[in-house]
Amino acid sequence: RSLGVGLNIQPNAVRELFALGIAADLLDQVGLPVQEWALLGLNGKEVYAEPRGTFAGYNWPQYAVHRGNLHMLLYQQVIERMGPDAVKLGARALGYDRSNPKQPVCHVQTGDGQEQSYKCTLLIGADGIHSAIRSQMHPDQAPIHWGGAIMWRGTLRAKPMRSPSSFIGLGTHQRRMVIYPISKPDDQGLSLINWIAEVTVDSSGGWQQDSWFRETKLHEFAHHFEDFNYDWLDVPAMLKAADCAYENPMIDRDPISSWVDGPVALMGDAAHPMYPTGSNGASQAIMDARIIGAKLIAHGIGPRALSGYNAELCEPISQLVLRNRSAGPFGLLNLLHDRCGGVFDDIETVIPAQERDTFMGKYKQAAGFAKDMLNAAPATIAVGATV
């Protein structure tokens, strides 16, 4: 079943999906191309705005999608191409055994609670931020890192703001809203709108809730945003109209020295869980998979391919994890808060245009989706290439 709310797929990852035959005709069923990315101050005035995807001259769009619907689309594509037995639902990895260096064994618990073991040539751990594969590979890793930000997420049906598909960040580092549509407007002009409400608190006492993700009630957090009321947006009313709300802390893990242990590798959140400030966690997971594929073609199905993947991505993406801790592209709101408390009349007198453009350009380059670099890049995997 479809779970989750919204996420963004950056042009570098959309390029890879298109190459796999998962193009606009399919992605339009689970989301829509992003037209604009905008930051606004606490008083609702524009700090920075830019077109995104093909609207900005990229050869590929940026997509805002419903996370659960994207999962279902990818699941259906795998089943159609690889057969009904290709995916075992309800199972989770418990760990692995490398006593035979040429044939690792993955230990799995199935949905009915039984434990099974599978021999394999390569094992790719894509089991998320609580990865059992990573825990075994790096038993001395630091605990989950929480920097003090708490997020509440939800959806509602409403008219899009600013444009038919604008990604909006509003407020300050201490209190902010992220709002964007994840469906095209219906006959009444209403889209499914994804919203994220965030506050930053003192994290010295650690996360005190029993779970990392829970359903919550409006009264537990809406008071933080009572003054987010503008002539173009009434945030308190928007929150009251939401279908549901979920709470989770903004968490990641400290980077690790390697994502690979011989024939075993990590990818996605198992390798590099990162703050969602750059909207590129899902995109990087897609890139991981494609780089692994490219290395398998170059080196064959064996540890050399995984070593090549690790050599190409581990260090730069580890740096991106740390960069996202400083708020990623939302770091402009940090500057704004430091210089004027988030309230201004003329943004040019607070953060000049050249400073804003330079800040954003550095982040895009670090995240791998700077426009000219991406548009000129050769295909990750050549058409027709096989292992």
Task: Enumerate the predicted regions with their spans.
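Glycine-rich FAD pyrophosphate-binding loop
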Residues: 1-5
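Conserved N-terminal helical subregion
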Residues: 10-155, 205-207, 214-219, 364-387
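C-terminal helical "tail/cap" subdomain of flavin- and related membrane-associated enzymes
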Residues: 44, 257, 278-280, 294-387
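Conserved FAD/dinucleotide-binding core of flavoprotein oxidoreductases
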Residues: 46-71, 109-117, 157-244
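Short beta-strand or tight-loop elements
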Residues: 89, 102, 173-175, 246
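Conserved mid-domain beta->alpha element of the FAD-binding
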Residues: 124-125, 152, 179, 220-221, ...
